[in-house]
Amino acid sequence: MILMPMASVVAVAEPKWVSVWGRFLWMALLSMALGSLLALLLPLGVVEEHCLAVLRGFHLLRSKLDRAQPVVPKCTSLCTELSVSSRDAGLLTVKTTASPAGKLEAKAALNQALEMKRQGKRGKAHKLFLHALKMDPGFVDALNEFGIFSEEDKDIIQADYLYTRALTISPFHEKALVNRDRTLPLVEEIDQRYFSVIDSKVKKVMSIPKGSSALRRVMEETYYHHIYHTVAIEGNTLTLSEIRHILETRYAVPGKSLEEQNEVIGMHAAMKYINTTLVSRIGSVTMDDMLEIHRRVLGYVDPVEAGRFRRTQVLVGHHIPPHPRDVEKQMQEFTQWLNSEDAMNLHPVEFAALAHYKLVYIHPFIDGNGRTSRLLMNLILMQAGYPPITIRKEQRSEYYHVLEVANEGDVRPFIRFIAKCTEVTLDTLLLATTEYSVALPEAQPNHSGFKETLPVRP
């Protein structure tokens, strides 16, 4: 959508300048301008209260201006707030075009944030930085200044993300370039240290005796939990106990969608195929392997489309995947990368995360792309000696957020998200196999009728 200058928007919205609405609008504009000027003349102790009044005034003005704007459809699940750190999770947005009023409000908020920062009122400044970026997510100066603010708070990863986002929008922004050059090596060191922590926990898991009954119990429970969460992320409403019932008895759950139950059976078939065929196989991962995984994932729901590339264009949130005629070529290139020396030299968690992202970016299938991508990710982890990980349904928003950020040009938050999931899985295994073990929810320690577990390789 092409945005007109504010004066143009106002003129189109109300050509009768003598109307009550027109007079009110210009009075509001004038009051905002005078109010901002007054802020410079007021004693410093009054600025904090004034900035809040200014923001309230902008909210009123924005509500009037928005009446002149075209109605924009609400974003899909992928167009949501972005989690960049635990402190500011869900407070920054991506892929949103600011209105003229929003940009004006963002500039006012940034100026007030810098003033609050100068006064040492960092809590107020923090909220104003976030407000500025909420109003205008592409405000490069606000991204850069918030990055500096985050650095001062020792949040190097968030600062580096903000500089990177600023440079994605404006590649030659001098201040962001200088700041990013400073934070990039620090962030790389932090990421490598985190990988080392994960590696040390993998070694502890590998030291658990192969015959450990506690390990077997938790892996069986993890199997059910993985199926439950991976289909729940896609909207499946079956409960964990219902999924256990389906897989253990092979009987349908009365009153529940047969399609949802077939999704569970398909996931079970795909995981069984991976466990018995691919995990221990020596050699490269082929395109046929991925097609076979997908054939099982979707085979009980849509056997016609299972195991074949899509033939229609799809839209995933803001992301437009490759045209159907380009899918096979991109999958060939993806397969070459999967088996390349560059990929093999990556840390296993980074390799698995990138493989997941690349496959879901291509979106080669009409349905089942997310489930297939997560299975491929776990295949790579297991081949490297790691346990399979679970992305829980409660993490759905964060999961989609970091995928959206990757689509915007920074895949590192997604890699860190997968690393976090890996660490949680390792901690669960270590906790469950200690003397004071804690079972997973709805676990049944004495259950032994289910044999197809996802193995932890010795």
Curated annotation (Swiss-Prot):
Pfam family of the protein (one): Fic
Cofactor(s) in the UniProt record: Mg(2+); Mn(2+)
Lumenal side: 45-458
Entry EC number(s): 2.7.7.108, 3.1.4.-
Main localization, broad class: endoplasmic reticulum
Residue ranges, Cytoplasmic side: 1-23
Domain notes: The fido domain mediates the adenylyltransferase activity.
Family, per entry: Belongs to the fic family.
Name listed for the protein in its UniProt record: Protein adenylyltransferase FICD
Upper lineage: Eukaryota, Metazoa, Chordata, Craniata, Vertebrata
Gene designation: Ficd
